[in-house]
Amino acid sequence: MINRLEVDEFWADSTIIEAGDYVFVGYCMGNEGQPVEDQIDGAFVTLENRLKLAGLGLDSVVKMDCMFKDINDLNYLADIIKKHFDGKYPTRKAFTTDFIREGILFQIDAIAYKG
């Protein structure tokens, strides 16, 4: 069964989808326009809040795609992950991308296991 928990009609996408034992979470950003460290932290807060809608926490995340405007900002990621994940780290991939708005420096998409 597929359950769309949060739908963005303007962008025509679902930011949280439950599909079987997995939850797919997209477009996690926070603190737009602030320094990248604050945006990374804010993105994890957004991810955590969205996972709560599915009854999950960050410890259920098994995979993350971490998108940066500047890949050199990857140097901030590990310490912020350690702050949020308490040793239960997901696999992750980091890459650069262009964002639609100038103030966005970081975004997360994630997959969580619900089983």
Across the structure, where does each feature detected by a protein language model lie?
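N-terminal presequence-like segments and the immediate start of the first folded domain
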Residues: 1-62, 68-115
